[in-house]
Amino acid sequence: MTDPVLEVRGLTKRFGALVVSDDIELTLRPGEIHAIIGPNGAGKSTLIAQICGGLRPDAGRVYLGGQDVTDLATRDRARMGLARTFQISSLAMEDTVLQNAVLGALGASRSPWGFFRPVLGRTDLRARAEACLDRVGLLDKAAMRTAELSHGERRQLEVAVALTLSPKAFVMDEPMAGLGAEGGAAMTTLLDGLRQEAPILLVEHDMDAVFALADRISVLVYGRIIASGPPDAIRTDQAVRDAYLGDGA
């Protein structure tokens, strides 16, 4: 079995007496989509924040490519190849599509931001940004203001910005949120193709997308993983059905 690209060992977080992450163990392997599902308030956002560096765990470690990144800031994890997309858009709406992608590429580099010279003049950053826009199908809209994109296209742009990091692993927080049937199908196809470039840790409420994409599913309830395994096993697990999926799954 191949070594995991991303690994979580014994991650624990408490807010007073409330345990929001209870000794969580997770792995993400090359070529894999590992979905995390669970009801609202289960602790998914808190878990993702700890994995990506926005929140420090009380116990446990996070490893990326075999290196312990637990004590690193979010930007340093990103530069090491941990690429995150957010449930709520973090794009610069008044900038162009290309500018958003170039700024993503600049953030991934260790070069100075260069406020006194146009970053679009950096041919290396522009080339990387354009390649990532092309990968998600937005290169023809590079000059458009981001605010003019559809909701689905903004989701695609968020993936393109994440791609500029040349990621080792993606952490995606509800990429299907707000998408209709057509947009959801397009995003499903995009994510399915991305897994060979970098595996995806996917937090998602859209169960059709989860069961279509995931190689493994972990179910988080009240800060604890109650089940983890292939989709068919999760679908028929009675504890999972009782806690989250219901009998109609």
Task: Label the model's feature ranges.
Residues 2-249:
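Glycine-rich phosphate-binding loops of nucleotide-dependent enzymes
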